[in-house]
Amino acid sequence: ILLPFFWLPEDTLELRCHRDHVLYDVWQKQGFIQTTEGNVIHYGFIEKFIERLGETYNIREIAYDRWNATQMVQNLEDMGFTMVPFGQGFKDMSPPSKELFKLLMEGNILHGGNPVLKWMAGNVVMRQDPAGNHGTGPLHPQRNRQRQCL
């Protein structure tokens, strides 16, 4: 069972809807996206949210992308959470990507019909490096290599 949470800055919600052609505002009204005050993500809001989740759920560890996460990692560690760095390359992404694919194929992923998660999943493609490691990334049109050389 997946219990996802998503945040966007309140002041940029309308702009993002028009720019991305995505129903963020509808999802926010339906409770699938939470907004934070201002025009950038308010990390303090998210940290407090995670702290409250920790009162309800037994959160064993939180995986995070190392890029630009130092302050949030320190704050969550101060709250007692175990923080685990998690890279975004094939080395770290391969084992969980394979497991996710397996669970999806077996029909063992339940997300309660969350439209945000469904939209995000529809914009991800599984990739494989020359060593056979799998990873995920955003869905982009695949360019023809011969065309790039012209």
Task: Show the residue positions of the predicted features.
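Acidic, metal-ligating active-site segments
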Residues: 1-3, 149-150
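Switch/connector loops and helix/strand junctions flanking conserved nucleotide-binding motifs
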Residues: 13-14, 71-73, 95
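Metal-dependent DNA phosphodiester-chemistry modules and their immediately adjacent helices/loops
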Residues: 23-29, 75-150
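Short, glycine/acidic-rich beta->alpha junctions
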Residues: 45, 64-68, 92
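Residue-level marker for well-ordered alpha-helical positions
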Residues: 47-48, 70, 98
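Short glycine-rich phosphate-binding loop at a beta-alpha junction
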Residues: 56-73
